[in-house]
Regions:
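Active-site-proximal loop/turn and secondary-structure-junction residues that shape catalytic pockets
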Residues: 67-71, 91-93, 121-122, 169, ...
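Glycine-rich, acidic/polar active-site loops that bind/position phosphate-bearing ligands
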Residues: 143-328, 337-340, 347-590
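Flexible inter-domain linker/hinge segments
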Residues: 7-8, 20-38, 42, 188, ...
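N-terminal hydrophobic targeting/anchoring segments and the immediately downstream early-domain regions
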Residues: 2-24, 141-157, 162
Length: 729
């Protein structure tokens, strides 16, 4: 084992980039190759069936089961021509990942042979065993039945030899056991509420779509080095490891030249993603060494979220092909930036209007201000819930660490927009600033054209920032299912818009002019939600104190933060809009607490294992070597001379003894803390115990281990060090 580290390091240096050959010269030629998109629907479905299915997708018309057989037959024909042999209902249980069970297309033909068969019944509904998925107590282990139901709004796709059908997943009694079902309900709610408000400005609007553009950050580590780190393999992050002398302090990795092996991985990933209609647009080095980002063009939120879940699965598969392992954990390495997944969120109408973009007319700008302010109202009223929607054991390491947004939800608007809202709040005038277009900036360099400057700057410390025509929710973790944040955000905004319309209509009913009524309600809301607006430094201690004075949620304990889901305001909002009922919310919190506990529990067990089987033996071995050196020196020199010459070694022997003793004591205390926590029946209280008593002991043990790493001879250290994990590419 002592030599494994050096073997994998040597092997990593020998690896060369793999050749990646695109299936065609232009990406547009293979985009959507493995997706049953509209073009393929048109080709493989009868015309009347095609038109009915498009009506379902575009207008939310209920699916007529009578067309299911024809749709299934068309899908099967296309899939079989592509060499597909199996199908699966692909869904997103409360595990943060995806789930699937593969069934073959074959059935008996009644003559002793087999035929390929796929019916509408199999397409529309399946019965996966729900007993082994997280349910938060909604289902008992012996109550196995659950239903997966086809989501026609998200295209069917092919992975290898399997036809994957995006579905929702519900219990036998109808409660949602997944992320997609409540997401679809939240998107419907914001569509209804936003459309109603839109008609004050554009009576012709029939539908509002929620758009999402995610930015997926990740680390790549050589597979050999990964295999020599049990903590990475089992927890997704390093539980120990001293900082590399060089990490990200030179700012030379961000937007730097992409390493050749990584470039080959990215190219391969993009090809496979494009074949699945994932519109990858951007790739680049991130701030930390061996950290990267991939981002697509924005899409409708449900499809964008499916694509993100699909891409994360694809990344793991392609990384292994190229001799890497992809790390999606929010904080795989201490001392350098963690990974997030910025969610760029916006609303747009079926007539092509971006609702969070300023316009050229007073009507456009009044609409713009309305949707900005009501978004802020939703975020302000439910800022604790939004924090709960993005919180996890992994993301808790990243938030508030002077590298990511703080664990206090606030919104950055920029000076121009903030001044506009202040102007509206304090003025009785109906005229609005013209926010259209961009200002020009001349650089006085003849070869460089005039730059167009956005009307807002960027504030990287803001968790929820306005960026010109959308809001960027930056607190979402890299490993998360975006649906969690999107459910909370869209529901909160839907509630705010619904309440806004109710109050405006009440004023209109009293005879007030529509514009006057809108401005009166906006003035009231601008004043109400002002505490959520913050354009300063979110990392400062002053902001924490200021946020408390403003009444914002400043809780930092992950298990306690989850309580916000069960606040009366949250329950009332989710129930009134038909997103989730109290029972479903309680169940999801049980799952969140249980997941948090198990994450920390696994980390604690792995730390104990590595500590006692790697760290302590290596440290004591080096200590014995030092002791032998001292003994040998005393054989050669006088006692006085030997003591003088061996003073440093004696000091190291003593330090190793003290640190290993603290480590061994720490591991014993860690085990005992786990035992005490495990006896707690309440999932909430157990999670709090793991947060308060188990996690801190792991940090204490890590501190001692990281000090030993600097003492023990490098040749004896068995675990790949940060300099190797982060700089071998």
């Amino acid at each position: 084992m002592a030599n494994l580290r050096f073997e994998v390091v040597a092997e990593a240096f020998k690896k060369k980039p793999q050749e990646v050959i695109p299936p065609a010269e232009r990406p547009s030629e293979y985009f959507g190759k493995n997706v049953f998109n509209r073009a393929k629907m048109y080709k493989y479905l009868p015309r009347d069936v095609y038109e009915q299915l498009i009506d379902v997708i575009d207008n939310g018309t209920p699916l007529d089961r009578s067309i299911a057989d024809a749709v299934a037959e068309g899908m099967k024909q296309w899939a079989v021509e592509r060499g597909v042999t199996h199908y699966t209902h692909w869904f997103q249980p409360l595990t943060e990942g995806t789930a699937e069970k593969h069934d073959a297309f074959i059935e008996h033909d009644g003559k002793g042979g087999m035929i390929e068969e796929f019916s509408g019944k199999l397409l529309v509904q399946q019965e996966p065993d729900a007993s082994s998925f997280p349910s938060g107590g909604i289902r008992n282990t012996f109550e196995a039945r659950g239903y997966s139901a086809w989501d026609p709004t998200s295209p069917v796709f092919i992975i290898d030899d399997t036809l994957c059908i995006p579905t929702i997943f519900i219990s036998y009694t109808g409660e949602a056991l997944d992320y997609k079902a409540p997401l679809l309900r939240a998107l419907h709610a914001v569509n209804v509420a936003a459309t109603e408000v839109c008609r004050y400005f554009y009576p012709e609007v029939k539908k509002v779509t929620c758009n999402l553009g995610w930015e997926q950050e990740y680390f790549l580590v050589d597979e050999g080095l990964y295999s020599a780190r049990p903590d990475l393999m089992l927890t997704g992050r390093t539980l120990m490891g001293h900082d590399s002398a060089k990490n990200q302090q030179m700012d030379d990795h961000y937007f730097g030249t992409i390493p050749d092996r990584v470039q080959a991985f990215m190219k391969d990933l993009e090809i496979q993603a494009l074949e699945l209609s994932i519109p990858c647009k951007t790739r680049h080095n991130e701030v930390a060494p061996n950290q990267f980002e991939i981002a697509p063009i924005f899409e409708e939120t449900n499809i964008a979220n499916d694509h993100n879940m699909l891409l994360m699965s694809l990344m793991k598969k392609v990384a292994r092909k190229h001799g890497f392992r992809v790390l999606l954990h929010e904080k795989p390495f201490a001392g350098i930036n963690g990974s997030g997944k910025h969610n760029n969120w916006s609303l747009s109408t079926d007539t092509g209007v971006l609702l969070h973009a300023p316009g050229k007319t007073a009507n456009d700008n009044l609409r713009f201000v309305t949707f900005v302010v009501e978004t802020l109202m939703g975020v302000y009223k439910h800022n604790g819930l939004l924090k709960a929607s993005i919180m996890s054991a992994g993301n808790a390491h990243r938030l508030g660490a002077n590298e990511a947004p703080p664990a206090i939800i606030s919104s950055f608007l920029g000076k121009q927009l903030s001044d506009l809202l202040d102007h509206i709040e304090s003025s009785d005038r109906k005229d609005l600033f013209n926010m259209a277009g961009k200002q020009g900036m001349k650089l006085d360099i003849p070869e460089i054209p005039e730059l167009l400057i956005d009307n807002t700057d960027r504030n990287r410390t803001s968790p929820f920032a306005f960026t010109g025509n959308r809001f960027e929710f930056r607190a979402v973790g890299s490993e998360a299912n975006c649906a969690s944040a999107m459910i909370a955000l869209n529901t909160a905004v839907a509630e705010a818009l619904t309440d806004f319309k109710r109050r405006v209509d009440a004023l209109i009913a009293k005879g007030q002019d529509t514009t006057d009524a809108i401005l009166d309600v906006l003035r009231e809301d601008i004043k109400t939600c002002k505490p959520i607006r913050f354009d300063g430094n979110g990392y400062s201690e002053e902001w924490v104190e200021e946020a408390k004075r403003r009444g914002l949620d400043c809780e930092t304990s992950c298990p306690v933060i989850f309580d916000r889901y069960l606040d009366e305001a949250s329950v009332e909002m989710f129930e009134s809009l038909g997103i989730m009922n109290r029972k479903e919310l309680e169940a999801r919190n049980e799952v969140k607490w249980d997941t948090y506990t198990k994450r920390i529990q696994i980390e604690a067990r792995v730390m104990g294992d590595i500590t006692m089987n790697h760290i302590v033996p290596v440290a004591t071995h080096y200590q014995s070597r030092l002791a032998k050196n001292v003994m040998d020196m005393r054989q050669i020199f006088t006692p006085e001379k030997a003591d003088k010459l061996c003073a440093r070694n004696m000091k190291l022997i003593e330090e190793i003894a003290e640190r290993t003793q603290k480590i061994e004591t720490g591991v014993e205390e860690l085990v005992n803390a786990r035992k005490v926590a495990n006896r707690i029946e309440s999932e909430r209280e157990k999670a709090i115990a793991y947060h308060d008593t188990v996690a801190p002991k792991m940090e204490d043990i890590r501190y001692q281990i990281d000090k030993l790493e600097l003492i023990v001879a490098d040749e004896l250290w068995t675990l790949p060090k940060y300099r190797e994990l982060l700089f071998i590419r």
